[in-house]
């Protein structure tokens, strides 16, 4: 058996949580491989909306094992809150949730460093979620970090104190005023660490290796989106981990030859949270409609998402970098009501028309070139069969498939798991 990947192909918020939830019944194991509580994976079913930040999106299926991989960074405080929020739903967490010992811990001082760093940048802010993600990954690559496995050691508190002393020295060097009570934050942190200790801690690379040998079906769940990748995203307006397909190998400890299908998810339009270039962004009534109808507000921060037409140049780039083999189109229902739809098929860049993503896509450097397609007005939310979709929508899908040269296997027409059309 192989490990299939599920990746976001835009700037995050594509709807990965819902699709993982839909796909879970076909897999034995769901594994998160990067990111942290800056992710907000939203699932809706039985009239209830759930938002997961650290726990994999397969947790609501009683037969699936869910793994938080070594590439993830975990804030014990936020993890405990997620556990508490799931308590009323009788989710079998202790049996079905496994955590890699090699996953790094987000400390309270990481969040403080994140806030101080962002505040010190003034107008050059990158739009951090202020969850401590960046500073934690910096400690990881700087070989200073604490890992989940360290909480099992007798000297964990001494290791913690050694690192936080360094953090406090760094905080003192920032010329910004960050108000905090570290004793209160630490009390909450160590209480949450006790909860974390109560879960099954594993060597996830060995666990997954044995699972593959036994023929288990595994789905690797990414967070954020490909255009936020630390290497291939719109740097520096990116996250601190590898969100593309390669990140699954390093974030779980699986070999490249073990990768099977690479499923890429994208919205029928484009959104972005926070700062950074966005060539197809809309500032008119069309953009406002996408925001309101699509409920485009961040699941983690509550921030309003910027909205714009689908950018095929950026989408093709994401498909190429990860070797996507099949596509899932989300939120087709949000585009109902537009007379005309626009799709960016190329950029004007330095006086030339190009169809690839250049080094710098700041708004002053690229102008989107659009192809127009006919819109539709039919309400899609109760449609269950692809043949019942309006012709204008199937024409839209056909156009995208031709441009991307990858099949679109699923079209989502609403937030609930039942509002999913498979071709």
Question: Predicted segment positions?
Answer:
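Non-transmembrane, aqueous-exposed alpha-helical and coiled segments at domain scale
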Residues: 1-423
